[in-house]
């Protein structure tokens, strides 16, 4: 599976150096989502997510600078955190991202997670990727409203 990662533009395998670079630069909405779900600092949440994920991609711009990070756990929980600079490559990212999601859905028949109801960019991304919003409930350490999302590969 990891050998096939090289086929995707704007994605490369993540490193711990990427986490250190991205953590202080994350979007306000992503920092708020991290705080609401886990009560962690951005660095701690990224590091923990990196360790718990089977595969983690760094999203890079045309200069190969990290602008986001994206992963999937062994159980199929998909996640994405980004900087404001992701908007600079939004169209090419979305096009390529759909290929990555389809690729991941060949290994994981069910992709899922929770998204903060206030994180409109993540909600748009999940809809673009074909996720269904199946539940709205209080979630995380701050008990904020989140949507439960799922994408099933037929």
Set out the residue ranges of the language-model regions.
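Conserved acyl-CoA
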Residues: 96-111
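A short beta-loop-alpha structural element at the N-terminal edge
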Residues: 2-24
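C-terminal "cap" of GNAT-fold acetyltransferases
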Residues: 139-154
């Amino acid at each position: 599976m990891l050998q096939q990662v090289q086929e995707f533009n704007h994605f490369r395998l993540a490193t711990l150096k990427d986490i250190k670079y991205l953590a202080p630069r994350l979007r306000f909405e992503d920092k708020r989502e991290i705080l609401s779900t886990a009560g962690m600092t951005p660095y701690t949440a990224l590091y923990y997510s990196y360790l718990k994920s089977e595969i983690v991609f760094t999203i890079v711009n045309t200069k190969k600078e990290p602008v986001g990070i994206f992963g999937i756990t062994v159980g199929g929980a998909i996640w994405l955190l980004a900087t404001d600079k992701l908007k600079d490559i939004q169209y090419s990212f979305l096009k390529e991202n759909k290929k990555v999601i389809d690729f991941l859905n060949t290994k994981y028949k069910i992709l899922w997670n929770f998204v903060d109801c206030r994180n409109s960019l993540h909600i748009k991304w999940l809809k673009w990727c074909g996720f269904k919003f199946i539940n709205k409930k209080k979630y995380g350490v701050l008990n904020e409203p989140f949507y439960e999302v799922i994408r099933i590969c037929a």
